[in-house]
UniProtKB/Swiss-Prot annotation:
Record-linked InterPro entries: Ribosomal_Su5_D2-typ_SF (IPR020568), Ribosomal_uS5 (IPR000851), Ribosomal_uS5_bac-type (IPR005712), Ribosomal_uS5_C (IPR005324), Ribosomal_uS5_N (IPR013810), Ribosomal_uS5_N_CS (IPR018192), Ribsml_uS5_D2-typ_fold_subgr (IPR014721)
Keyword Coiled coil: no
Protein name: Small ribosomal subunit protein uS5
Native organism taxonomy: Bacteria, Pseudomonadati, Pseudomonadota, Betaproteobacteria, Burkholderiales
Organism per entry: Burkholderia cenocepacia (strain ATCC BAA-245 / DSM 16553 / LMG 16656 / NCTC 13227 / J2315 / CF5610) (Burkholderia cepacia (strain J2315))
S5 DRBM domain mapped to chain residues: 17-80
Keyword terms of this UniProt record: Ribonucleoprotein, Ribosomal protein, RNA-binding, rRNA-binding
């Protein structure tokens, strides 16, 4: 079974969403009469202002698989609270055997992240971040681990509400 990794392709639609294709794999299904070839596509979609979604699509042809993945990514979007083009605080994410460390960075640092994580930050609109992956480098698991970490982000207002204090008391 041959594996085909596509370069990350970017696209911006008329609805203001940024789309990136992370990978396209050739997959096979073995049946009594032989093998049935198909394609699986992994994509991320973001609005450049903190909203992000991931999708996976499978079909007999590449364009159809990519289209299915993009539609699924649009349906699965969620908002991540950003602070001046970076993350609120350091956070860990995990999925399967992939683990990621995501940390905010000073202005001018840029996106220091490898492979699929960079695509996630690009479509999300993060300009400064440092990210490190540990364990498996499977693109699907890395994207899911990155999204897991991003979901764990909390704002000072969230923490203040949980503790029953004001934001000024939390920030000192």
């Amino acid at each position: 079974m041959a594996k085909m990794q596509a370069k990350v392709q970017a696209d911006e639609r008329d609805d203001g969403l940024r789309e990136k294709m992370i990978s396209v794999n050739r997959v096979t299904k073995v049946v009594k009469g032989g093998r049935i070839l198909g394609f699986a596509a992994l994509t991320v979609v973001g609005d450049g202002d903190g909203r992000i979604g991931m999708g996976k699509g499978k079909a007999k042809e590449v364009p159809v698989a990519v289209q299915k993945a993009m539609e699924q990514a649009r349906r699965n979007m969620f908002k991540v609270p950003l602070k001046n083009g970076t993350l609120q605080h350091e956070v860990h994410g995990k999925h399967g055997a992939s683990a990621v460390l995501l940390a905010p960075a000073k202005a001018g640092t840029g996106v220091i992240a490898g492979g699929p994580m960079r695509a996630v930050f690009d479509v999300m609109g993060v300009q400064n971040v440092v990210a490190k992956s540990h364990g498996s480098t499977n693109p699907y698991n890395l994207v899911r681990a990155t999204l897991d970490g991003l979901r764990k982000q909390s704002t000072p207002a969230d923490i203040a509400a949980k503790r029953g204090k004001s934001v000024e008391e939390i920030l000192g």
